[in-house]
Amino acid sequence: MIDVALCMLTLVPGGMGGSETYARELTRQLHGIPDLRAVAYVPRSAQGFSRGIPETVVNRIRGKSSTPERLRSVITATAFSRSIRQRMSGAAIVHYPFTVPAPRPSRHQSFIQTVLDVQHLDHPELFSGAELVYRKYFYDAPARRADLIITISEFAKQRIMHHLVIAPERITVAHLGVDRSQFVPNYGAREDFVLYPARSWPHKNHARLVKAMTLLRRERPSLRLVLTGGGLDALKGLPDWVERRGLIPADQLRSLYQRAAVMVFPSLYEGFGLPPLEAMASGCPVAASALGAIPEVCGDAAVLFDPRDPGAIAKGILQAIERGPVLSRTGGDQVAKFTWEHCRDLHVEAYREVIRRR
């Protein structure tokens, strides 16, 4: 029996994008695996996060999203590290799905770190000085010490190897997945709006998308833009044809995927990118960035464009509308390649590999 502690004390519910989907699904998929016993350790603010494996709540820690508040959570976890480690002492492996090893495992435990991407090293201009320092000490330095790193794309693996000089055999790639039972494809008529589900982080590239839509509306003046995700109030001066939905329930997002003319994904950088796959599972045509891991995820089932050029974004959206029926069919084939069960199996094999190396 392999005992694994999923230490998620830096979790901020509703504030961590696709990484939160990944970690939650991991708690579901690791339940009931023969010869594996996993327990999730979560902060008080995330009580009830686990969807399958047992959960232990650490009451002294409450996750928040700003850099100072995240640092405070790490300091708190470190201050109470003895008692937290005692609670996790039965685990042979401590796995940190949210990257930051807080608290560090004991010397008697193996240490696995999930590193979703190294965007801060590829694009430091998108981060504050404080955030870069935080990631240097709590992302990069621990990664060099980890027994194994799990990442979510070949693109991310190559960038981790490049920046952190880590041998390829110490990095496992586990593509994320989509639960197709949660998405009902619509291959029929669609409405006159473009959907972009993303938080207002700088690399999500909302400003260029609005410029692209302005160009596109010269040909299609009825076309609207619907934005979902957290922090959208930070986007100022949006035209009246842009609709800000903010954070919405999963069923509402699935409905938007079913009805949108196109799901656009103009991100400048992704370690993976779940929304294109979710859109494909809904039969929605996808126009997406040609940067980062996005081509690896989308394959030939999306129109790819240069996200740095508003004209290219506009052209990509228009092509996706025109090729809608074909993209709907090829998207279904593409999304079938990405399952949470396969993601789980690669994690389980990573755990077993770490035990074999001990």
Regions found by a protein language model. Give the residues of each.
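Carbohydrate transferase catalytic cores enriched for Leloir-type hexosyltransferases
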Residues: 1-358
